[in-house]
């Protein structure tokens, strides 16, 4: 600890007022009057530009979380007034848009309460000593005027502080150049720990709630890991793309076991169960390092290197793209490379994680295209969890592309060149990229049989040629087709971060136990069902070879915790192990070294 503390503002009060020279600025005030009611109070002043009617909306979703959330559902006590405080007529234009009759006022002020009672990566939360929100939650916008700059001030209980990705200091105002920057701003208010360190000349802040979760041992390990992650990824991409970066951590306790992260242009917001955050000695949990590496690499891949289907963002509706396998899955691959290249992971850890990705790909209930999965992620399919599939399959695809590029070029080219070219030729030119653009770059950098690879494995459903592909980097594949434990339940993650049974397979162990749709999975045998790890993979490994053994399912049904009894069943499945060849050829060794160290050449 002991680093410089940045961006901390104490209680601020603010009267919304129009200031002629900056009339185009939208001004917001966020206040907390009664934390126990879980209500933020929001005021926003919009210039009318002489319009008789102003349309104001809240987003339907948050970029990075590809799910319609409809944030307008949390609004109550909406009102609209003119510059002198006189009430103005308003009504609802659609589910998320308010229509206000301006009465020829030069500016109007809208106000509302916002319910914040959910632990989620893209939903607001407020309690006795702490609050958290994303810009998409609280800040209305004027459709068609996302270019407007904005200012935000806070009115908070005594002793509360503010840490936000927005630019500002002291009591504010905090500023955003346009609505996209405002919508992307993660914010903590309340009492929590704030630390900071400088990496590559830029400040990196760490905000952790609750404060007592950030012990000296945790601080030491967190700072060391983040420094290595940032240095490694900054070096790959040519330096940090931000003025300052913030890592927001929300450490939660049982019975909620939700974990994950959400990327932002100058921040990441991570939720982690206390049991997975650190151990008793303050060492970071197994999921922590890959999570931080993944979210940090999103600074480039998706926040800046973005599919054209999401350029610019449309907050009103779904934005479909077939490229989430690249934006999320290849980001997973680069997170793994970061951990290897920085020394945070050993070679064995890297190969084990890759093998686990392969296990997940092969365990899919049916052959599927990662492009189709990218598009379908918005609907939370009943039988296939698309988002849980294009992450591992995209990661494996990234590694196969990397090895193929290095093999074809004698290690003078690799996927690093492709990701950097996407950054300079598309993001830095102010545009998104398409599948055709990506394929053109892969072709330019020497990807052999690109059209065939794309049609078979990315847009197609053929199994990956693991053995032939990995052999080029001197990696041996141990493929075992065995009987693996099979529970027989499809349980997607709910908005509350719980795994809820949706479909129970006929004749399965789950059906024999009496598991029913709507049951919340808590434990499968002795395995806690948590989102910070793939519990289904853990289940298969833990109960391998135990067909017929007793198996207890702990679930929550109708508010009660009950135990259901069944027996382990198995079905045919594939598991993988990866290891380095003890006697690689010179070329194999060169390719592996280039991949592992991020180098090209002889």
PLM region spans:
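Juxtacatalytic substrate-recognition/specificity segment
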Residues: 195-324
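Post-HExxH zinc-binding segment in Zn-dependent metallohydrolases
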Residues: 268-270, 275, 304-305, 316-367
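C-terminal recognition in membrane/secretory proteostasis and scaffolding
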Residues: 335-336, 344-602
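Surface-exposed beta-strand/loop patches in extracellular or lumenal glycoproteins
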Residues: 40-72, 140-157
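Short, hydrophobic/aromatic-enriched beta-strand segments in well-ordered soluble domains
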Residues: 42-48, 58, 98-128, 150-158, ...
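Extended, low-hydrophobicity, Ser/Thr/Pro/Gly-biased non-transmembrane segments
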Residues: 112-193
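A surface-exposed beta-strand-loop module
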Residues: 32-33, 64-127
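Zn2+-dependent metallopeptidase catalytic core
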Residues: 71-77, 115, 147-163, 167, ...
């Amino acid at each position: 600890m002991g680093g410089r503390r940045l961006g901390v503002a104490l209680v601020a009060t603010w009267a919304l007022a129009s200031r002629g020279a900056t009339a185009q600025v939208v001004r917001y005030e966020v206040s907390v009057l009664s934390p126990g009611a879980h209500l933020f109070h929001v005021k926003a002043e919009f210039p009318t530009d002489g319009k008789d009617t102003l349309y104001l909306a809240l987003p339907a979703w948050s970029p990075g979380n590809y799910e319609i959330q409809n944030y307008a559902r949390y609004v109550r006590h909406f009102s609209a007034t003119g510059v002198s405080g006189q009430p103005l007529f308003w009504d609802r234009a659609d589910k998320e848009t308010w229509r206000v009759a301006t009465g020829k006022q030069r500016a109007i002020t809208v106000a509302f309460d916002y319910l914040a009672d959910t632990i989620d990566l893209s939903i607001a939360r407020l309690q006795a000593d702490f609050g958290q929100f994303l810009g998409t939650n609280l800040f209305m916008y004027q459709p068609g005027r996302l270019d407007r700059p904005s200012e935000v001030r806070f009115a908070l209980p005594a002793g509360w502080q503010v840490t936000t990705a927005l630019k500002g200091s002291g009591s504010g105002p905090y500023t955003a150049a346009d609505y996209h920057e405002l919508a992307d701003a993660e914010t903590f208010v309340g009492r929590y720990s704030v630390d900071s360190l400088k990496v590559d000349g830029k400040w990196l802040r760490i905000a952790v709630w609750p404060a007592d979760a950030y012990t000296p041992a945790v601080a030491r390990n967190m700072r060391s890991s983040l420094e290595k992650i940032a240095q490694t990824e900054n070096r790959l991409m040519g330096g940090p793309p931000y003025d300052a970066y913030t890592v927001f951590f929300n450490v939660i306790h049982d019975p909620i076991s939700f974990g994950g992260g959400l990327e932002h242009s100058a921040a990441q917001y991570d939720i982690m169960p206390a049991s997975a955050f650190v151990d008793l000695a303050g060492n970071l949990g197994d999921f922590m390092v890959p999570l931080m590496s993944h979210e940090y690499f999103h600074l480039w891949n998706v926040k800046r290197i973005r599919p054209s289907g999401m350029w610019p963002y449309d907050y009103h509706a779904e934005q479909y793209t077939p490229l989430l396998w690249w934006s999320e899955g290849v980001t997973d691959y680069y997170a793994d490379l970061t951990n290897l290249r920085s020394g945070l992971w050993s070679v064995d850890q890297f190969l084990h994680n890759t093998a686990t990705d392969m296990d997940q790909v092969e365990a899919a209930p049916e052959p599927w295209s990662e492009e189709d999965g990218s598009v379908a992620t918005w609907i939370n399919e009943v039988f296939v969890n698309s988002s849980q599939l294009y992450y591992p399959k995209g990661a494996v695809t990234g590694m196969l592309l990397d090895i193929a590029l290095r093999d074809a070029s004698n290690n003078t080219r690799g996927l690093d060149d492709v990701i950097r070219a996407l950054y300079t030729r598309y993001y830095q030119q102010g545009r998104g990229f398409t599948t055709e653009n990506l394929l053109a770059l892969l072709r330019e950098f020497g990807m052999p049989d690109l059209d065939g690879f794309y049609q078979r494995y990315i847009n197609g459903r053929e199994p990956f040629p693991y053995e032939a592909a990995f052999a080029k980097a001197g990696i041996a594949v141990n493929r075992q087709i065995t009987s693996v434990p099979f529970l027989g339940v499809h349980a997607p993650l709910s908005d509350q971060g719980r795994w809820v049974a949706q479909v129970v397979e006929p004749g399965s162990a789950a059906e024999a136990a009496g598991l029913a749709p709507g049951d919340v999975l808590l434990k499968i045998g002795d395995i806690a069902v948590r989102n910070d790890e793939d519990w289904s993979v853990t289940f298969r490994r833990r109960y391998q070879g135990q067909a017929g053994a007793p198996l207890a399912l702990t679930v929550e049904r109708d508010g009660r915790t009950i135990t259901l009894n069944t027996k382990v069943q198995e079905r045919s499945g594939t598991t993988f192990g990866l290891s380095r060849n003890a006697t690689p050829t010179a070329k194999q060794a060169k390719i592996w070294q280039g991949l592992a160290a991020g180098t090209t050449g002889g």
